[in-house]
């Protein structure tokens, strides 16, 4: 049984804000300078990343690393920036007219709405590639053979979970099935890849760079899968029940696009119940891991109850 030392919500929220501010500074330090003939692409990239967001993926990465080492290893920081760039690139492409056709993102005009559809495509591409350039900087932070291997493995995880067997694979099935009925097994597949894969990457990279044993990495991946699924179901719930001002994006976007979601298949009540079950199972997984990171436990709990 863990001792609750951060049960006070105000303490947690202050801590969360401080950690997100630090992450924003770290991400900022890797963003390109807006100069040269191609400065428009730099502006569009930076606009997309600076639009805000919860910074969940870098947060998960550093907190899982902290679980195994008690601190955030320097090699983790470039990966934290990289995963947020990849996540942002997926949002930039998601909003395009040929995809979800959304004009708003994170409370501002979406990237294509601000810079044009052509720049929206290029900015998404640029962020995804630049992310790997940034991640590779982690090699400069380590010198031991084992640590160098870990950085190599982390890059492999990042690529696999972003690409055809991960996020892009999930988006492919999502696009192909949009506008028509989607069977539950395919919806689970889409969620596991489209949302789950990057959350798995963030936690797994944190574990690998934190020197976690193989069996612990498996638990981390299982934990991340549950958090990812719960997160996406909550997203579906908020699309039905949420307030556009709070969400910072168009509520009812799923209905507008006639999208099958967890809520349309299972109903609102069952969806809410499943989110609670998944989060409880995720906390169980977390409790199997060494170390104690109560902040991470609170973060998982609060995410499930989020309103945006």
Question: What is the meaning of each model-derived region?
Answer:
Residues 6-14, 27:
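Charged, compositionally biased N-terminal leader segments and the immediate start
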Residues 1-5:
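Short, Lys/Arg-enriched N-terminal segments with co-localized hydrophobic residues
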Residues 18, 22-286, 294-304:
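Mg2+-dependent prenyl diphosphate-binding active-site environment of isoprenoid biosynthetic enzymes
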Residues 289:
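Short arginine-rich
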């Amino acid at each position: 049984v863990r001792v609750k030392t951060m049960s006070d919500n105000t303490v947690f929220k202050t801590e969360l804000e401080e950690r997100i501010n630090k992450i924003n500074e770290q991400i900022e330090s890797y963003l390109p300078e807006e100069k040269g003939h191609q400065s428009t692409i730099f502006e569009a990239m930076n606009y997309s990343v600076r639009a805000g967001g919860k910074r969940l993926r870098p947060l998960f990465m550093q907190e899982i690393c902290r679980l195994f080492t008690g601190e955030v290893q320097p090699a983790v920081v470039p990966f934290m920036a990289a995963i947020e760039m990849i996540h942002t690139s997926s949002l930039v492409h998601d909003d395009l007219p040929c995809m979800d056709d959304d004009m708003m993102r994170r409370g501002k005009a979406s990237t294509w709405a601000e810079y044009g559809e052509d720049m929206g495509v290029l900015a998404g591409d640029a962020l995804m590639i630049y992310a790997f350039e940034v991640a590779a900087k982690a090699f400069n932070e380590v010198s031991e053979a084992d640590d160098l291997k870990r950085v190599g493995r982390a890059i492999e995880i990042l690529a696999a979970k972003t690409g055809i067997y991960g996020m892009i694979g999930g988006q492919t099935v999502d696009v192909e099935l949009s506008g028509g009925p989607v069977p539950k097994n395919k919806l689970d597949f889409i969620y596991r890849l489209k949302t789950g894969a990057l959350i798995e990457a963030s936690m797994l990279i944190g574990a690998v760079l934190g020197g976690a044993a193989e069996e612990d990495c498996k638990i981390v991946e299982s934990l991340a899968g549950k958090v990812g699924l719960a997160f996406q179901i909550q997203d579906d719930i908020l699309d039905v029940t949420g307030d556009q001002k709070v969400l910072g994006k168009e509520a009812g976007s799923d209905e507008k696009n006639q999208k099958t979601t967890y809520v349309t298949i299972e109903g609102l009540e069952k969806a809410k119940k499943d989110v609670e079950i998944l989060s409880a199972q995720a906390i169980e997984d977390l409790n199997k891991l060494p170390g104690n990171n109560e902040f991470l436990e609170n973060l998982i709990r609060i995410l499930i109850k989020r309103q945006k």
